[in-house]
């Protein structure tokens, strides 16, 4: 799921993804936006 959070690295996406989808959520930075996924 791509969320409306700007990023330059996956580390910036980890916290918002975990807040939205729970502590097991993964995070990537794609095209300047965060992408969250459940493993």
Curated annotation (Swiss-Prot):
It comes from the Eukaryota. The keyword Secreted applies. Pfam families: Toxin_2. Keywords: Amidation, Calcium-activated potassium channel impairing toxin, Disulfide bond, Ion channel impairing toxin, Neurotoxin, Potassium channel impairing toxin, Secreted, Toxin, Voltage-gated potassium channel impairing toxin. GO terms for molecular function: ion channel inhibitor activity; potassium channel regulator activity; toxin activity. InterPro entries: Scorpion_toxin-like_sf, Scorpion_toxinS_K_inh. The modification Asparagine amide is found at residue 39. Expressed by the venom gland. One of its GO terms (cellular component) is extracellular region. Disulfide bonds join 7-29, 13-34, 17-36. Blocks voltage-gated potassium channels (mKv1.1/KCNA1 (Kd>25 nM), rKv1.2/KCNA2 (Kd=2 nM), mKv1.3/KCNA3 (Kd=1 nM), hKv1.5/KCNA5 (Kd>25 nM) and mKv3.1/KCNC1 (Kd>25 nM)) and calcium-activated potassium channels (KCa1.1/KCNMA1 and KCa3.1/KCNN4, Kd>25 nM). Has the structural arrangement of an alpha-helix connected to a beta-sheet by disulfide bonds (CSalpha/beta). This is Potassium channel toxin alpha-KTx 2.1.
